[in-house]
From Swiss-Prot:
Family matches, as InterPro entries: Cyclotide, Cyclotide_bracelet_CS, Cyclotide_sf
Species classification: Eukaryota, Viridiplantae, Streptophyta, Embryophyta, Tracheophyta
Crosslink feature (Cyclopeptide (His-Asp)) location: 1-29
Keywords associated with the record: Disulfide bond, Knottin, Plant defense
Species of the source: Clitoria ternatea
Reported modifications of this chain: Contains 3 disulfide bonds.
Designated name of the protein: Cyclotide cter-L
C-alpha cells in the first residue's frame, strides 16, 4: 500500500475514486 499524497484528517479522501482509502489520517491505495 502506497500513500496517495492526500490526508484525511478533516475531509475524506478524494482519491477514493481511484481506489484509495483512509488509514491513520492518510490516504493509501
Amino acid at each position: 500500500h502506497e500513500p496517495c499524497g492526500e490526508s484525511c484528517v478533516f475531509i475524506p479522501c478524494i482519491t477514493t475514486v481511484v481506489g484509495c482509502s483512509c488509514k491513520n489520517k492518510v490516504c493509501y491505495d
